[in-house]
Amino acid sequence: MKLDTSSLAHTQWECKYHIVFAPKYRRQIIYGKIKQDIGQMIRKLCEYKGVEIIEAEACKDHIHMLVSIPPKYSVSQFMGYLKGKSSLMIFEKYANLKYKYGNRHFWCRGYYVSTVGKNRKAIEQYIRNQLQEDYTEDQMSIKEYVDPFTGEPVKEGKWE
């Protein structure tokens, strides 16, 4: 059986985490060109620290990442670095965002983190399906203008 570990000089390690973080005020800003740029920035910053991105998905108002962080970094140390440096890079490229966010803080203060063990495949699948789940949730919030039982158009106010 092949072990799924990485190694340093005298250390074998497997430190995988599911991390979720969001823009300040949970604004739906991560789409289009800015989504591509944020993805490139995060990949570059992870590469600098030797952090492997196993799976990632950027939704409009949050980012999911499954990462392997070397044991020489704590999760909080890495997240402080990632969110701090990426904020500076985002505001450097999109200076107009300073007025929306103020104080050069693009991300919310906190984040969600969970360790990953035997459930790695399930978490990868969950992250891959995040965009579809967000889209489905958005569709459910749209008003129905067709009666689901008869298929006939519905006058406004009938369902309210």
Which role does the model predict for each range below?
Residues 1-160:
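Basic nucleic-acid-binding interfaces
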